[in-house]
């Protein structure tokens, strides 16, 4: 059966913030791919847009924090500063070096890059090389796992058993772990799923490897989140405009205690997938809730 990631793009945001709060238990993680005017719009912001984003964060006193620091705080119950933001880039495209890197260094903003290591090893056009990453790493940029091959990890090959799939996927992720450690001298603790795709079986693989994982679904991360499928705000094209950017960084986490179904992968022929969310009974401002679904 052909499987497809269930991109409902459930854009569930509580849009009011509490300006009197000086500490928080949540953070907005921003996701970029290309920072260029010459790459596909669906995965790109222009250098001008990226600059506008950084300027907004600076001018409005956002605390831009290393992603690993955010995760440690959330897992241990430590407080985060109000208006917490973390910057991430997926795929290690060359614009991470030419456009993002000099700007984040200038602003003294930490940056995390999720690397699909096969593309780097093969020297594919438009990607970083290891020397560039070593230079970035020396200035504090964190490099994390994005798998080795950047394939659709949730999909089984033809006639592939569940056990064989698990071994193949674990080996793919471990290869990326090894290559980053060999080249940069650090062992990743984080992974972002290629294409944001995950299912319950893949989450179990990630758990067995001791990794914290991110998807591409929108939302703030917080202390009660699932650390095998943390949300990020994808920024590209229309969704990188300042009007939507400001809403994302000013949102609050969605306080749910459960969801059904747990597995976000559905058959391709399922045209009416359903999602049930169970809210924390103590949630405030429930009337502020908005739901936007691609359809």
Residue ranges and their predicted role:
Residues 235-269:
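Short, compositionally biased P/S/T/A/G/V-rich stretches that sit at domain boundaries
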Residues 175, 180-183, 203, 207-218:
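Catalytic-core region of carbohydrate-active enzymes that cleave or remodel glycosidic bonds
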Residues 21-85, 249-263:
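N-terminal pre-catalytic segment of deacetylase/amide-hydrolase enzymes
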Residues 7-17:
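Sec-dependent N-terminal signal peptides
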Residues 256-295:
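Beta-strand-enriched, solvent-exposed domains that form extended recognition/catalytic surfaces
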Residues 25-40, 60-63, 80-85, 93-95, ...:
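Metal-dependent polysaccharide deacetylase catalytic core of the NodB/CE4 family, i.e.
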């Amino acid at each position: 059966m052909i499987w497809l990631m269930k991109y409902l793009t459930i854009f569930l945001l509580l849009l009011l913030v509490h300006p009197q709060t000086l500490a928080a238990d949540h953070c907005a993680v921003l996701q970029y791919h290309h920072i260029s005017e010459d790459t596909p719009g669906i995965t790109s912001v222009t250098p001008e847009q990226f600059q506008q984003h950084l300027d907004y964060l600076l001018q409005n006193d956002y605390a831009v924090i290393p992603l690993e620091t955010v995760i440690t705080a959330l897992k241990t119950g430590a407080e985060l500063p109000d208006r917490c933001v973390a910057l991430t880039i997926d795929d290690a495209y060359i614009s991470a070096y030419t456009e993002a890197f000099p700007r984040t260094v200038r602003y003294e903003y930490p940056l995390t890059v999720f690397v699909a290591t096969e593309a780097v090893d093969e020297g594919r056009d438009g990607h970083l090389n290891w020397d560039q990453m070593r230079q970035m790493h020396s200035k504090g940029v964190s490099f994390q796992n994005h798998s080795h091959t950047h394939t659709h990890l949730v999909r089984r090959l033809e006639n592939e058993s569940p056990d064989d799939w698990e071994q193949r996927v674990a080996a793919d992720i471990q290869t990326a772990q090894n290559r980053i450690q060999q080249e940069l001298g650090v062992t990743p603790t984080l992974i972002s799923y290629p294409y944001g795709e995950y299912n319950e079986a893949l989450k179990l693989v990630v758990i067995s490897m001791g990794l914290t994982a991110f998807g591409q679904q929108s939302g703030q991360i917080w202390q009660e989140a699932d650390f095998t499928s943390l949300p990020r705000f994808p920024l590209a094209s229309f969704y990188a405009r300042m009007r939507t950017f400001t809403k994302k960084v000013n949102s609050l986490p969605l306080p749910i205690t459960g969801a059904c179904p747990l597995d976000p992968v559905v058959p391709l022929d399922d045209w009416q997938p359903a999602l049930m969310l169970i809210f924390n009974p103590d949630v405030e401002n429930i009337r502020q809730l908005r739901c936007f679904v691609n359809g």
